[in-house]
Amino acid sequence: MGEIQTLNAKQNAGQPVIRLSGISKSFDGKEIIGNLNLDVNHGEFLTILGPSGCGKTTVLRMIAGFETADNGQITIDNQDVTNVPAEQRHVNTVFQSYALFPHMTVFDNVAFGLRMQKVPAAEIEPRVMDALKMVRLESMAQRKPHQLSGGQQQRIAIARAVVNKPKVLLLDESLSALDYKLRKQMQIELKQLQRQLGITFIFVTHDQEEALSMSDRIIVMRSGVIEQDGSPREIYEDPKNLFVARFIGEINVFEATAKERLDENRIRAEIEGVDSVVYFDQPVTEGQKLQVLLRPEDLRIEEIKESEEKGIVGHVTERTYKGMTLDSVIETESGMRVMVSEFFNEDDPDVDHSLGQKVAITWVESWEVVLSDEQEI
């Protein structure tokens, strides 16, 4: 077990384990990936996130060697593998279907790759059992796949991949077949296993929650292009454009007009007809259209009387109790629907708002993200 755990101990952390340089790929004359450049570091959990058809699985398949790039270069551990067949690359893939052999035992499934590589029999058994111990399934070595739960099958597929000592483990929508509770459990287990092994994981998903909860780093893709590359916190709290902001979780987008610059960090802007101060350090001109982005959990609402005017105001049109939070929809005077998420405190008489209640919407200064006006494509 120690041998696999220290797999990457001698790797050079100064060089990326995978580098994609100028990669492009087309199918039937349609460009899917265009001039993509990406470095993946040793030992990191990288998630490629994006909607269906954005090219994320194509990127994974080109790294694995299942697809050939039309242009560009792919290197793994500083070796050019652009035209190297899949079976000669030091990567393994865990697919959504797991692809376990139904007629083989768990042990034989995990040992299959080693036998294909003609690893000596005396070495196979300890390596297989070490891999099964990592996923806590050594007691099920003699069972068949149909005797296992979905989560157990997924862990066997991972054991079969890591027993080959890959430099990189590729996971293609590997949790999507599991139910919600099991998927949450496997998210934790996958991240723990990745830390234990020290192997680079590249995970492809369209599920934003999976990406945020497991990743060291997230790549957000759209139409074959990387829209943003950053940590989960950077992606969520500081989206670089409207597409990323709307793709990662819920967000409110207020239309705004710049009025004047107050200092190097702040400007005065009109939002929903109300003078407001927002943080924006980019060049701006009077009258310039902007978009002010705020997550539902960043907003606060205060109940006010119908006769009161207090900043941005609206009326509660929907409310949803979700246990830990109370989610409300506020319709402003302009007709905009604003989502607000508040932690539910049963001892607070003001947290459960009545439908039709007039409220004032506020937020902590600097929590907003301000973008130059753009229309989502």
UniProtKB/Swiss-Prot annotation:
Membrane topology: Peripheral membrane protein
Major localisation: membrane
Protein residues bound to ATP: 50-57
Disulfide linkage: none
Domain ABC transporter: 18-248
Pfam families per UniProt: ABC_tran, TOBE_2
EC numbers for this chain: 7.6.2.11
Presence of the UniProt keyword ATP-binding in the record: yes
Catalytic activity from the UniProt record: ATP + H2O + polyamine-[polyamine-binding protein]Side 1 = ADP + phosphate + polyamineSide 2 + [polyamine-binding protein]Side 1
Top-level taxonomic group: Bacteria
One GO molecular-function entry: ATP hydrolysis activity
One GO CC term on file: ATP-binding cassette (ABC) transporter complex
Keywords: ATP-binding, Cell inner membrane, Cell membrane, Membrane, Nucleotide-binding, Translocase, Transport
Location(s), subcellular: Cell inner membrane
Task performed by this protein: Part of the ABC transporter complex PotABCD involved in spermidine/putrescine import. Responsible for energy coupling to the transport system.
Assembly and binders: The complex is composed of two ATP-binding proteins (PotA), two transmembrane proteins (PotB and PotC) and a solute-binding protein (PotD).
NCBIfam families associated with the record: potA, PRK09452.1
Similarity comment text for this entry: Belongs to the ABC transporter superfamily. Spermidine/putrescine importer (TC 3.A.1.11.1) family.
The protein, known as: Spermidine/putrescine import ATP-binding protein PotA
Organism field: Vibrio vulnificus (strain YJ016)
